[in-house]
Amino acid sequence: YIIGTRVIVGTTSMMTSKPFIFLLKHFKLAIIDESSQILEPNLIGLLSAVDKFILIGDYKQLPAVVQQSEQDSGIPTINDSQKGGIIDMSILQDICLTNCRNSLFERLIHWEDYEERSEFIGILRRQGRMHPEIAEFPNRMFYRREKLEPVPCPHQLETELSYTLPSEDALDDLLKEHRMIFLPSKFCKEPNVSDKINANEAAIVVDLLRRIHRFYGERFDAKKTVGVIVPYRNQIAMVRKGIEKLGIPELEKISIDTIERYQGSQRDVIIYSFTIQNIWQLDFLAGNSFVEDGAIIDRKLNVAITRARKQMIMTGNPEILRNNQIFSELMNYVKEKGGYF
């Protein structure tokens, strides 16, 4: 059926900027991928021009970037007056339009829950990225409803990591044995230095990169083997400086970026530097969270962990991170599995 069908692929911005396309051709079906990252106004024109639509996305990962605060984009919960008239806010509440920063995808999911319906929702339970030992924590904390399962792909069936060179020390042994690892960092705040920089964690990340490059040898691929995620661009620069000092050209080509820009990407090994050294920075690090079925869904942490195919390595200050429930549970989980150094 698909082979005999003419399929047109384009971005939402391209399609909406060329409305004449819909005058030339009528589409029976529109499939919108990554729809949880698209705001409702950007989709309405497209969806009204087709007979049927399918939205694909994950509202438990990062949503669209909105400049307004959550309060400013929110819908009042009581009736409001405007130009002498009365707006009945209950109408919007009934269709789960509670905040304009939410995607249509997320609103429809909540609307179905609110109406206790499920016939319009399909869950893709199979995932072909994370090894089961990495997927266990996101499943336990974020995907209790969905209960993701491996496809399985070949790397998801591997029982051991392919690090065969002799170990240099205990950390190498840990890297060989565990897929979820946490390395504690130390306080290293300096006067007149940005809070968005952590020299100790940058050094840890650089050392980990050296070790991974050594283990992979000729198999190392800068675009596939390893990636580094940090919350601040200042930290990216510090890690880059450390890599330059190693004198390993292949490592200078790896991707080091924020969680927001890493969404949609994957690497065999992901190194996540929490970076923060102040309790107040936890609000930024875990700011994109919500509660579902009594459980906290931390979208940023979810994205970070689910980028990894074979190994997830994290470094952060335990004394700071313990002040956040999810981060505390993450460290406890890694300890329970033996991956806490």
Each language-model region and where it sits:
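Inter-Walker segment of RecA-like/P-loop motor cores
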Residues: 1-14
